[in-house]
């Protein structure tokens, strides 16, 4: 059996001592209000620009869709009339059934133009 003794050594502070701790209250330098105002204003300006540019495109697409539907609606109405007249139907004076009304859609589309 090998017998050895480990010498116990206490840890000591470095020569000259530890550096002083800074424990005083410190705060970051305040941001001037003008910088905050400019930042918020620029973000709002960019957001407003994006919103209104998208609104212009969206309105153009809706206008094109309305024009397209107003051009094709007479054809759809004629097809609906042909299907109605070709089908055997009861006398309109003794029934409450009515054909689908595309006239209301046409009036609504033409009113919006």
Curated annotation (Swiss-Prot):
TM spans (from-to): 31-51
PANTHER family, alphabetized: NADH DEHYDROGENASE [UBIQUINONE] 1 ALPHA SUBCOMPLEX SUBUNIT 13 (PTHR12966:SF0), NADH DEHYDROGENASE UBIQUINONE 1 ALPHA SUBCOMPLEX SUBUNIT 13 (PTHR12966)
Organism: Dictyostelium discoideum (Social amoeba)
Compartments, as annotated in UniProt: Mitochondrion inner membrane
Role noted for this protein: Accessory subunit of the mitochondrial membrane respiratory chain NADH dehydrogenase (Complex I), that is believed not to be involved in catalysis. Complex I functions in the transfer of electrons from NADH to the respiratory chain. The immediate electron acceptor for the enzyme is believed to be ubiquinone.
Membrane topology designation: Single-pass membrane protein
Subunit text: Complex I is composed of about 45 different subunits.
Protein name: NADH dehydrogenase [ubiquinone] 1 alpha subcomplex subunit 13
A cellular-component GO term for this protein: respiratory chain complex I
Coiled-coil ranges from the UniProt annotation: none
Family: Belongs to the complex I NDUFA13 subunit family.
């Amino acid at each position: 059996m090998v017998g050895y003794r480990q010498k116990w050594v206490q840890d000591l502070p470095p020569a000259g001592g530890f550096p002083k701790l800074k424990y005083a209250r410190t705060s970051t330098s305040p941001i001037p209000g003008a910088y905050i105002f400019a930042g918020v204003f620029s973000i709002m300006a960019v957001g407003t620009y994006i919103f209104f540019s998208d609104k212009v495109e969206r309105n153009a697409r809706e206008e094109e869709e309305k024009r397209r539907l107003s051009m094709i609606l007479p054809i759809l109405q004629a097809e609906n009339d042909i299907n109605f007249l070709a089908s055997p139907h009861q006398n309109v004076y003794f029934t409450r059934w009515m054909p689908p009304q595309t006239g209301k859609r046409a009036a609504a589309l033409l009113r919006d133009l």
